Amino acid sequence: RRLITEKALEPVPGNPKDPGTVYLCAADNEGNMISYIQSNYAGFGSGIVIPGTGIAMQNRGKGFCLEPGHANAAAPGKRPYHTIIPGFLTKQGKPMGPFGVMGGFMQPQGHVQVLTKLIDCGLNPQAAIDAPRWQWTQGLQVNMEPEFPAHLIEGLQQRGHKIGYDINRGAFGKGQMILATPHGTLMGGTEPRCEGACAAW
């Protein structure tokens, strides 16, 4: 309320610092759930806007390789490699909940780590998302968040991994999750590494 005054102001458009991906998950009391991720890629995507909608088309076709015979070579009916991965967790064919971890190459790594904390370690959605993460980059290099337990880092070093530390918390992915309990209660978790929120009504 402090920022709203009684004086007229000329509207000023926002100036986002960086482009990025958006992840959204939602669930209702009837059991409907959605896992949604959107990313135009390469800033403004393809630069093509669907007439009359204002919706910019994505540019994930940039992920194709033009080298003949390459596994990701462009061809009719093929989809390019990309990192848009909206996740959805089921158990014995029943929906448990939507989740996603944004962050390019970190997405599949983040999915595995969050689900491991949730399923194998028994953490709730928020604790699973809060837990420290690692990121494999290439070769034997593994970057760790500073909070990672020292004995696990030492174990990786003994196996020959090169350990790096990244204080840019956003480099380790940005996750959101909703989990339905067996009793039908919905629990949510949101990323402390970036802007995010859980809301219920």
List each model region and its residues.
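Extended C-terminal subregions enriched in glycine
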Residues: 30, 77-78, 111, 120-170
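Glycine-rich phosphate/pyrophosphate-binding beta-alpha loops
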Residues: 22-25, 35-49, 101-107, 177
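Active-site rim segments in enzyme catalytic domains, especially the processed small/beta chain
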Residues: 29-97, 121, 125
